[in-house]
């Protein structure tokens, strides 16, 4: 892309067309497990899934109930922040569970529904059952050594949801973690 940006205009168009054609062929060859109808969501889900099964081959991921309306007014960037951080956390939790219990079932389930102007997203995943609570914080603490560089994913999700007058909540039931996000389907 950088080469295309610095080339002359005549060559740039031909090179750009060739590049886009090759990119299109590459995308066609990718194995897409998930198709929600939203290109950003589909790309993110498939990328995260393929990344996860490299280290957790038997992990199950279900996004059949993750659907977005055609008139989605929430910016793709914000959907990416919400789902990207949620999936990173869920995948990491599944890895930790597998590390402690090699025969444990690992799963991530994503779903959404719309009620009026509100969109509700829920991500449920298996985990080891260990929640580290942080004083004066609404979210669990990271257990990673570098706490300055980690542990901000849920705060980023909350900030993105806040742009749409939304909210974030989480719950634990045995060894299942559930993250719930509510958003108003309107531009901020």
Where are the model-predicted features located?
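Conserved ATP-binding N-box helix of the HATPase_c
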Residues: 2, 76-102, 158
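Histidine phosphotransfer helical core of two-component systems
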Residues: 2-39, 70-73, 103
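Short beta-to-alpha transition helix within the HATPase_c
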Residues: 18-25, 37-57, 119
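Conserved glycine-/histidine-rich ATP-lid loop and adjacent helix of the Bergerat-fold HATPase_c
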Residues: 156-165
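Glycine-rich nucleotide-binding loop
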Residues: 118, 129, 173-180
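Glycine-rich/acidic phosphate-handling loop/turn and adjacent ATP-lid/helix
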Residues: 117-151
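Conserved short strand/loop->alpha-helix "switch" segment adjacent to the catalytic nucleotide/phosphoryl-transfer site
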Residues: 33, 61-82
